[in-house]
């Protein structure tokens, strides 16, 4: 029949063709991006671009990469490729090759992350400063966020405290000295029933539970809160400072009760990095997660020599949420996953 066929795409999509963010918010996004680039330009950081599609995924058991398969020149039998979860590894390769201090603004991808403050595809602002440690980089993050948000909202005086101090203040326990059983008892005392099944062998799941439920809700209320010196077992790609207890030289930044940034005094020891990759892979195997090979090109760069530096990844979409008072990520994205 003449005229028969599927309805126009817009009608069949039930209105999902429209952006979920308002035009005012989308214009604000553009303005904030321009301010961020201006902030870096004033400090003479080089903007870089690295591949979104990589031969290596993340070994981190807490993060799953999107995978795809490449067929073509250079891989006659095909090969698995990964959408990056962070530009960290190739940026460190640039640092080892002599780039100097650098930054990047890019889209990254993480499997299974969706919700009020998560989207499988999101924007990171990531930068590395030569000669800096995690305390110096906390100053940088504080300065960038305060300056970029200045036209949208004013913030109170930032607060800084160690991971231990935050736990002692809001949970009433020393997170470094408490056993898993003691942390479980603490969770029960605070009425947390979601810890069932975490077991008594590893303290970190209990620390994460207590942090997310009892500490983070108090952080960043009208001001930036910066936590630093995390348990050594949570070092990820940060250096560990010897002591009693040893601590990871890393920090997280919170605003409006949500994590905004995560930074490290970067590990430069290739042997230690390889050992951490292997620990991650063991945990993935025991948890039944997909196997991921370590990034050999990163390890080669560390062998060549990573300069002393600190790096941080800041969630740009959450920064926009903070600027305009949004409660859900979809309010600051043109097309969240449901509309992609």
Which residues does each PLM region occupy?
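Class II aminoacyl-tRNA synthetase-like tRNA-binding/catalytic domains
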Residues: 2-136, 194-195, 216, 321
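Active-site pocket scaffolds in enzymes
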Residues: 270-340
